[in-house]
Amino acid sequence: EILIGLVGSEMCIRDRNTITGIADAMIDSTPVVVIAGQVATGFLGTDAFQEVDLVGITQPITKWSYQIRRAEDVAWAVARAFYIARSGRPGPVVLDFAKNAQVDKTEYTPVEVDYVRSYLPVPEMEPEAIQQAAELINAAERPLVLVGQGVELGNAQNELRAFIEKADMPAGCTLLGLSALPTAHPLNKGMLGMHGNLGPNINTNKCDVLIAVGMRFDDRVTGKLATYASQAKIIHFDIDPAEIDKNVKTDVAVLGNCKETLAAVTELLKPAGHKEWLDSFLPYEQMEEE
């Protein structure tokens, strides 16, 4: 189960001091519910002491930002906030409590939320994309898997191992994806990006099929986008459709929870061996040990 961070703040400066943390949580897919204070509803829009439009400020950097103006709305708003924060691709939610919603009394009735209209937390898996991904991997001579935090968020560590082991594919991990694959696993070739290891970084531009799983191709991993893995066919597994083609053009997009999509593709993979390709990482590993 995904745990949620809970942040409480008073009005004005303390609310605004949460902005950087909220933005980081959005980028890092960290579920957080921020409980913030606001002036009473009768003072909204009057530039009252310590009034700030926290909802307007945080809408671009949250999954949901909502102002609670009545005590009667607290139960359903809090339930919805926790559901949205932890479902699908996790992220931050802000609840801006007007003062009267904080101090008024109302009868509490427990509310459970497992659906929000127009909110689709997990896209439906597409069989055609599963088939296309498997075909590309089965035909690959130099496949490389890029492992992101989405594997951990989707609790798909076992599915990832089965996936790379069946097709004998080397893997590199992003900073937030390092815990998805044991460091001692023979197919784990280290960390990607500007602070990462030589092997996965250099061979990103030598592989023929690049498989990204639950990662967003940020600039610390890709460097110059115009030349990044330009020789490779790219498969992108992700739960968030907004990440597809955002930074790197994808040949096959596999949408859905990677626990399910990895398992589905693995079923279609042919057992393979890529000894020569795996051996190409050894010189870089030896250089780093010296």
Which residue stretches match the model-derived regions?
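Short glycine/serine/threonine-rich phosphate/pyrophosphate-binding segments
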Residues: 14-22, 26, 153-156, 218-223
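Conserved thiamine diphosphate
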Residues: 49-88, 206, 252, 261, ...
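Conformationally flexible catalytic loops at phosphate/diphosphate-handling active centers
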Residues: 84-139, 277-278, 289
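Single conserved hydrophobic/aromatic residue that forms the stacking wall/gate
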Residues: 1-8, 13
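Anionic-ligand anchoring segments at beta-strand to alpha-helix junctions in alpha/beta enzyme folds, i.e.
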Residues: 9, 34-37, 125-126, 132-210
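Glycine-rich beta-alpha junction loops
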Residues: 39, 97-103, 149-151, 241
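Phosphate/diphosphate-binding loops
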Residues: 193-244
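Phosphate/pyrophosphate-binding active-site segments
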Residues: 72, 135, 231-290
